[in-house]
Regions:
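N-terminal secretory signal peptides that target proteins for export/translocation
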Residues: 1-11
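Bacterial N-terminal signal peptides
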Residues: 16-27
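Boundary at the C-terminal end of the N-terminal hydrophobic targeting segment
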Residues: 30-32
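Long, low-hydrophobicity ectodomains and other hydrophilic envelope-associated domains
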Residues: 34-203
Length: 203
């Protein structure tokens, strides 16, 4: 759910260009599926004006993206900023699928994972589906054309696994030269995170 009022966009700081090693794409509606190697499920709780709302989020991972894919995204963002990134993501094949309650979801074209002291972090960015009203009235919200999120998986205490989803965002560089999420609406907090490590070709 998106804010109706035209308030100032929120900004979430991200240190340096290392964020690009986590980038994820969702193209348009999901058409292709592959064998799942892992499935992560969570409940997303609204914050701010969405407080009290709860939706389900599922990320099916078929395979991890390569260092070559990461380099393409870094170069594309450097040359074309947020739109360059969106264009590059739209050309990549699907390596997963992201589903949200009430939608059929999106194909995911880039997924990256890094180890942490307690487990793993998986951060994703998807191409956001622009709504009819946004396109018809040519609203400013169309520039927030990514949906981003992250899972912090705790392998030692799974009850401490958390995450966040940013429904409408874009990537910008601030005055200090740092990469930031520029948020159109409040983030959603991920709770009750379940990590299902499946068998390729089976589940």
């Amino acid at each position: 759910m998106r804010h109706i009022k035209t308030a100032k966009a929120h900004k979430a700081p991200v240190v340096g260009f290392t964020l690009l090693c986590f980038l994820v794409l969702a193209s348009t509606f999901a058409l292709s599926r592959g064998p799942k190697t892992e499935t992560i499920e969570a409940s997303a709780m609204g914050t701010g004006t969405q407080l009290g709302a709860v939706i389900g989020v599922t990320l099916d991972i078929y395979e991890w993206s390569t260092p070559a894919d990461r380099q393409i995204l870094i170069e594309s963002f450097t040359k074309g900023q947020n739109q360059g990134l969106v264009n590059a993501l739209s050309k990549m094949k699907a390596v997963g699928h992201c589903s949200i309650t009430g939608t059929i979801g999106y194909d995911v074209s880039y997924i990256r994972m890094v180890p942490t002291p307690t487990g793993r972090k998986i951060v994703f960015v998807t191409n956001r589906l622009i709504r009819f009203g946004e396109a018809y009235f040519d609203t400013q919200s169309q520039s927030f054309n990514l949906t981003a999120g992250e899972f912090d998986l705790n392998d030692t205490d799974k009850s401490k696994s958390t995450g966040s989803v940013y429904p409408a965002t874009q990537l910008i560089i601030d005055k200090q030269g740092q990469l930031q999420y520029d948020l159109r609406e409040n983030p959603w907090k991920l709770v009750d995170v379940l990590d299902w490590k499946g068998t390729p070709g089976v589940n």
